[in-house]
Amino acid sequence: MNIIDLFAGCGGFSHGFKMAGYNSILAIEKDLWASQTYSFNNPNVSVITEDITTLDPGDLKISVSDVDGIIGGPPCQGFSLSGNRDQKDPRNSLFVDFVRFVKFFSPKFFVMENVLGILSMKTKSRQYVKDIIAEEFSNVGYKVCVIILNACDYGVPQSRQRVFFIGLKSDRPLNQQILTPPSKVIESEYTSLEEAISDLPVIEAGEGGEVQDYPVAPRNKYQENMRKGSTCVYNHVAMRHTQRLVDRFAAIKFGQSVKHVSEEHSQRKRGDANSISGKVFSQNNMRPYPYKPCPTVAASFQSNFIHPFYNRNFTAREGARIQSFPDTYIFQGKRTTMSWEKHLSQYQQIGNAVPPLLAQALAERISWYFENINLINDSNVSIKRMVQRSFMSQLNLENNVNVRQDDNYDKVHSF
């Protein structure tokens, strides 16, 4: 099936669908560096580097019949394009452009990704944002269900919960359990941070290079998967740190952050190295446990985390591994940016992305839905029995993954 990707970022969402056999025919992303990353890794896809609010879908020279699905994650920050409007009303946000494209292309399905907080968000008039979203899609002929997925359930070495609004045309049966991809691993076999990055070159602060050789062979299935088709390591450069910062990192133990260090290693006021800063962000400089999935990698992960074993922040490649980007996926633009620079750094691109393995699981589930639409329409078929039967058909047994069959009934909602 053909898809178009709105608010495409660097392409994590699209890449997951590609791994599931979909064909991306168009991506729209206004940030130059993220767009360059997308184009570099998807040379056969038409990428438009423009603000989506300025685009008319009728001018894109894409036939409506060629579009089977639309995916994307419109940013929820601010939820407003006008200062006098309700900032939390999605009808005042970029969300309306997602609806606009869905209305024009009339795809078989759409998937819209967002953060967990959107489910509890209300407007000034006390309406739930999620209800308004469902209503707006209903107005253009779609039913919506909402599922909450955690990336670590799908082989990603990261605990990352995200919300997915899945839309189908109103004449299609919509069942939440059927559209929820089955978990691919049990909790005791989650991919850990150490399993994800332990084969990468050992570097200290300020070391590394844009292209390096692998120092060792893959040590596990995850590393084998990430290294398929890759002959070297890209984007593995560690940031430079002052000695004061390196000493602070050395004082932080697993599970601790900057808030746990002694006064000797506390953050200092900007421009005054002798005065302790009154502001301490507990999420900064956190040293994650190596033998568990990493906590959520956000756009600010360059300062959020330090390596579990070395006294430095993660590299962009380590972040990409944690997000399940393959090593063949090479990031463009600067590694980091200053506050006044307008483009998205490699770290920001990676942290903003939908993990490809998570996207792949969702894409495979949608494919399964359309392949079994006749059975789903049959009211004599037990939904629960059908869901359980489908778990085994969705598995890649060659990768020796395990199934959890009892947890897919409490993380879905429908409208």
UniProtKB/Swiss-Prot annotation:
GO terms for molecular function: DNA (cytosine-5-)-methyltransferase activity; DNA binding. It comes from the Bacteria. Keywords: DNA-binding, Methyltransferase, Restriction system, S-adenosyl-L-methionine, Transferase. It catalyses: a 2'-deoxycytidine in DNA + S-adenosyl-L-methionine = a 5-methyl-2'-deoxycytidine in DNA + S-adenosyl-L-homocysteine + H(+). Its EC number is 2.1.1.37. The active site is at 76. Residues 1-373 form the SAM-dependent MTase C5-type domain. Pfam families: DNA_methylase. GO terms for biological process: DNA restriction-modification system; methylation; negative regulation of gene expression via chromosomal CpG island methylation. NCBIfam families: dcm (TIGR00675). Belongs to the class I-like SAM-binding methyltransferase superfamily. C5-methyltransferase family. This is Type II methyltransferase M.DdeI. It comes from Desulfomicrobium norvegicum (strain DSM 1741 / NCIMB 8310) (Desulfovibrio baculatus (strain Norway 4)).
